[in-house]
Structures are given as structure tokens and as C-alpha cells.
């Protein structure tokens, strides 16, 4: 079973294909666990067979869980609800828009600049933060499940972290933007939207290939920027209390998989 997840403001969210489980450290020190079944897009089984579309669909299904997590916890636990995170995201979006609006410079350098400028505020905010430690706890709990090791012994960087999408997205965005320029349609909103969706779909395909071939030299090369970002900015070594929270989320997810095997195979 493949498990994904994300750090919450005071906890961890883990997901399998069919279920989600979140564990939150309450103000009184207790751990609150919430869980449920994931909603799937209509025709999900068919969509999962379509290249370029399937990765985006899986991403959408993962993000669709967040409102349910918010309702279940009854507190502002999502990272996006932190005012500082909102400000950093707004700054990133503004800088990205400004860079993409200019026609000066090499397309390659522009994509690299967009990647750097769009990430910089978020990375500075995350570095050595509580969220980064919970991110590390999330990775360690998943790695421990996959390898059979103790969470404390597992690495805080993980091969399937969304950070590792950076290189695929830069490459696919460069390709679609060059295509738009060649066609003279880089200023058309609809063409830009379609190119963006194609770029994201292609990046997700490449990301999935990297996850299936983790020891391939190309996969290791493409993963390197994301791993280094995890090491330096987006993850920190968690405390034992934070590992306890991540373990609670993992235990609940595994309980659901064991308790409802028919649903898990549906």
C-alpha cells in the first residue's frame, strides 16, 4: 500500500488510495485523531488509465480531502490558514506573475527564476519551523512503514514528497512555454491555461515514473533538487512528541485499511 501525506499546523495528515487519517496535538497535550473515506471523481477508474490526466486527477482527489479534515478537526489546522503562509503565497504569486509577464531573457533562465522566486518566501517561512518538524515526522512515519524500521531511525527526506515535483515542473513548463512561443500564442489566456494543464499532467507522469524507478540514475538526478530543499528548508528533525502524533495518524489509517478491506479493494 502506498501512503502519502502532508504536515498540518499541529499534526500530520496521511492518505492511502481510499482513506485519510489526521492526528492533531491539542493544546492540553492530548492527540486528537480523525479519519474517513476519500471521495473519488466520477469515472475515476477510467480517468486513471489516461496519461496526463490521471496524475492531475489523483492530485485533485488528495486535495479534496482537506475540507473534510478541516471539518473533522474543527480548528485552523491547514498550513494555508496561517496568515504568514497566506502572505508568503501571495508574494510568491505576484513575483511569478511579474516574471512571466516579461518577454526579456532566455526561456530557460526565466523558468529557473520563476521556480526560485515563487518558492523563496515559502522556504524561508518553513525553515526550522514547527510545520517543518511535522513534515519530517510525516516522512519518517511513512518511511518506517515502508521499510520496517523505527520512525526515529528513518530519514526525514522522502522520495515521493511533493518537493520532488520541482524539477519535473520546471522541465515541462519550459517545454510548453517554448511551444507557445513557437506558435506565437504565449499571450493568449486560453492557450496559456491549456499549456499549464498539460505541463502539470506531464510533470505528474514524470513524478510517478520517478517513484516507480527510484534507483534509476535519471530519477535520482531529477529528485536531487527536491531532496536538497527538504534537507535544508521544508523538513526538520521532529521531536518524540511529534513522532507520536504521526504514528497515531498512521495507526488509524492502517486500522481503516484492515477494518474495511472490501472498501479498500473497491
Where is each model-derived feature located?
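Short amphipathic, positively biased membrane-proximal segments
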Residues: 1-266
Amino acid at each position: 500500500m502506498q501512503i502519502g501525506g502532508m504536515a498540518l499546523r499541529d499534526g500530520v495528515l496521511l492518505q492511502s488510495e481510499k482513506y485519510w487519517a489526521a492526528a492533531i496535538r491539542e493544546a492540553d497535550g492530548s492527540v486528537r485523531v480523525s479519519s474517513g473515506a476519500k471521495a473519488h471523481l466520477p469515472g475515476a477508474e477510467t480517468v486513471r488509465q489516461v496519461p496526463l490526466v490521471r496524475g492531475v486527477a489523483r492530485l485533485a482527489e488528495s486535495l479534496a480531502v482537506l475540507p473534510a479534515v478541516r471539518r473533522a478537526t474543527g480548528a485552523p489546522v491547514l498550513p494555508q490558514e496561517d496568515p504568514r503562509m497566506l502572505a508568503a503565497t501571495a508574494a510568491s504569486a505576484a513575483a511569478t506573475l511579474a516574471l512571466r509577464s516579461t518577454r526579456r531573457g532566455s526561456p530557460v533562465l526565466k523558468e529557473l527564476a520563476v521556480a526560485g522566486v515563487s518558492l523563496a518566501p515559502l522556504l524561508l517561512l518553513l525553515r526550522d519551523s514547527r510545520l517543518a518538524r511535522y513534515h519530517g515526522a510525516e516522512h519518517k512515519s511513512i518511511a518506517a512503514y515502508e521499510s520496517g524500521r523505527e520512525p526515529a531511525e528513518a530519514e526525514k527526506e522522502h522520495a515521493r514528497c511533493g518537493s520532488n515535483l520541482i524539477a519535473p515542473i520546471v522541465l515541462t513548463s519550459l517545454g510548453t512555454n517554448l511551444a507557445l512561443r513557437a506558435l506565437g500564442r504565449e499571450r493568449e489566456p486560453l492557450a496559456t491555461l491549456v499549456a499549464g494543464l498539460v505541463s502539470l499532467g506531464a510533470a505528474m507522469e514524470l513524478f510517478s515514473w520517478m517513484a516507480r524507478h527510484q534507483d534509476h540514475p535519471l530519477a535520482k538526478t531529477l529528485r536531487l533538487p527536491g531532496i536538497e530543499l527538504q534537507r535544508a528548508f521544508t523538513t526538520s528533525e521532529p521531536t518524540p512528541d511529534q513522532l507520536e502524533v504521526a504514528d497515531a495518524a498512521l495507526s488509524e489509517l492502517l486500522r481503516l485499511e484492515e477494518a474495511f478491506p472490501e472498501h479498500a479493494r473497491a
